[in-house]
């Protein structure tokens, strides 16, 4: 009976509010594999972390190398995923791009390496409840605007 109670407390109660999802895909164009795509979403007590990873693979790997990772963490309030931190890394033969963003209900901080030369068409600091691309996609899939 004690073993059952310990098992129940550790494995059942502890994970009642946890959800982990992951998926892996092969990326192809006209039937030719060019890369791998993986996506994970972990939810625990209204806190989430989602990560996407991309990497070249297949016959064209020597010609077009790329890799990227996207990490978003935040909270879930009223069934809406709200970003707190976002990191993006993208690397090709020609360049490496790193983006870091922090949020409350507004964008608090945006860092880009190298610094973006192009002038922004939208003032991101004025957007209310603006989220990173991954979290926005999750909210759409979740039926939220």
What spans do the regions from the language model cover?
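Alpha-helical structural elements
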Residues: 6, 20, 81, 85, ...
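N-terminal cleavable signal peptides for secretion/export
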Residues: 16-80, 85-98
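Solvent-exposed helix/loop surface patches that form functional interfaces
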Residues: 96-145
């Amino acid at each position: 009976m004690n073993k059952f109670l310990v098992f129940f407390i550790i494995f059942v109660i502890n994970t009642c509010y946890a959800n982990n999802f992951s998926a892996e895909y092969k990326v192809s164009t006209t039937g030719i594999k060019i890369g791998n795509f993986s996506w994970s979403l972990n939810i625990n007590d209204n806190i989430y972390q989602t990560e996407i990873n991309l990497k070249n693979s297949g016959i064209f790997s020597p010609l077009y190398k790329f890799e990227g990772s996207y990490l978003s963490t935040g909270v879930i309030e009223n069934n809406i995923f709200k970003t707190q931190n976002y990191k993006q890394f993208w690397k090709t033969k020609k360049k490496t791009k790193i983006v870091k963003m922090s949020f409350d209900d507004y964008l608090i901080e945006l860092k880009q390496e190298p610094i973006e030369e192009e002038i922004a068409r939208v003032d991101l600091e004025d957007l209310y409840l603006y989220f990173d691309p991954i979290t926005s996609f999750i909210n759409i899939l979740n039926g939220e605007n």
